[in-house]
């Protein structure tokens, strides 16, 4: 994968290198599945996870509220020679997009979400992780296929511990019943 690095006004570079281990895990799961995999990447940012999944052979729907970030992700796909891979690039509020996917009946075999602590959607929607993550997980669970491969959530919000995220996912019943208690 080739990722374009450039400093932003938020002192980010467009890449979180610590995510490479997750990208490798996604690729391993997709390649080992032996079937076509549809991935939904919410809060897709500059596309590292999207590119990893595309490179492994999955089709991806990449969603981010920032038009600039989606454009950057597309540039990263071009730099990685992945523009011929099946990817939908969507600029939208993640929760609103998932609600529409539920109405459309679209299903995904894998979900990746890396929500920010705080953000604004393209229509001025306010996102606060601690206020909105449970509802988003509840919605997103509804777009999982009958044979989901994985549901990955990354979070660096200081006020929300990994134990709280794990509790939310278990409370929603995403683990166990759908994944056979394997992950």
Positions of predicted regions on the chain:
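Non-catalytic substrate-recognition/targeting regions of SAM-dependent transferases
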Residues: 1-15, 24
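Conserved alpha-helix/loop element of class I SAM-dependent methyltransferases that forms part
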Residues: 17-35
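Conserved class I S-adenosyl-L-methionine
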Residues: 34-45
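Conserved SAM-binding loop of SAM-dependent methyltransferases across substrates and taxa
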Residues: 46-58
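Conserved SAM-binding motif I beta-strand of class I
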Residues: 59-64
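S-adenosyl-L-methionine
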Residues: 66-112
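Mobile active-site "lid"/loop adjacent to the S-adenosyl-L-methionine
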Residues: 67-69, 91, 109-139
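C-terminal catalytic and target-recognition region of SAM-dependent MTase-like enzymes
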Residues: 147-183
């Amino acid at each position: 994968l080739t990722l374009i690095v450039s400093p932003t006004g938020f002192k980010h570079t467009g890449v979180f290198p610590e995510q490479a281990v997750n990208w490798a895990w996604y690729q391993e799961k997709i390649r080992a599945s032996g079937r076509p995999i549809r991935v939904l990447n919410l809060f897709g940012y500059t596309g590292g996870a999207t590119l990893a999944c595309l490179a492994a052979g999955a089709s991806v729907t990449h969603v981010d509220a920032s038009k600039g970030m989606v454009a950057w992700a597309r540039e990263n796909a071009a730099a990685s020679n992945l523009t011929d891979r099946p990817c939908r690039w969507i600029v939208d509020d993640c929760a609103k997009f998932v609600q529409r996917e539920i109405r459309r009946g679209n299903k995904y075999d894998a979900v990746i979400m890396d929500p920010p602590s705080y953000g604004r959607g393209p229509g001025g929607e306010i996102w606060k992780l601690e206020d909105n993550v449970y509802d988003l997980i509840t919605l997103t669970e509804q777009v999982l296929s009958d044979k989901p491969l994985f549901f990955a959530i990354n979070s660096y919000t200081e006020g929300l511990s990994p134990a709280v995220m794990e509790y939310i996912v278990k409370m929603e019943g995403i683990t166990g019943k759908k994944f056979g208690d394997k992950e």
